[in-house]
Amino acid sequence: DIVCYRRWGHNETDEPTFTQPVMYDAVKNHPTTVTLYEQRLLQEGIPAEEVEAIKKKSRDHFEEAYQRFQGGGVEVQFETLKGKWTGFTRINPSEPVTAVAEDELRAVADILTRAPGGFSVHPKIQKLLEGRRAMLAPGGKIDWGMGEALAYGTLLRQGYPIRISGQDVKRGTFSHRHAVLFDVKTDEEYAPLAQTAQKGAHLQIYNSLLSEVAVLGFEFGYSLADPHSLVIWEAQFGDFANGAQVIIDQFICSCEAKWSRMS
């Protein structure tokens, strides 16, 4: 077993002996990790001069950093709008133009509503695909599921990667999405959206584990590292967002003000 302990208090102003005097008396008299390691090296035949040189090198490193800080020679660098984020702006006062040409929509819709040859689509899903294809006919009306799919498809076609995660995102909790089709005979998966990707873009869509805070935390981190991707986390039901509230409050809402980052 490894027994871990804190030698000092919670911070530089904390005094642990106020509340745990007996334990911290034992800690005070216990050799430090450095002392124990030094004794082990000496037992193994490492010359004392070499051991002392290792200790001195570490002390000098920290002392040099401390002196540099004392002299005001340290400039804090933030990654805000630098590196991978170069070219992004803090404020966009006007709505961006997101419209695409009709023939572009039709090309994407054609891909989204067809399965490859030999792929056995569920009969109800086949009917849904046919219904979506009819939405682009004269007089047709596009529903939410098709509108969402067209938005994703046109973004992928323009070269923007898309990443979606959540507890039932492949199908959609209320069966509105069906971004991934399943062969009824083989269980093979097919994602029509992935076929719309161009210019190096790719689609990632994952049914996640049932830990909202863990998944949203990971996806938030992914969004920091890849600003050109559309990264989406979808709560299975509205109140499931409660499980990820700490990420929403501490990182997403306060991302720029608190952490000088954008997402």
Where are these regions (language model features)?
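Flexible, glycine-rich loop/tail regions that form catalytic "lids" or insertion modules at the edges
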Residues: 2-263
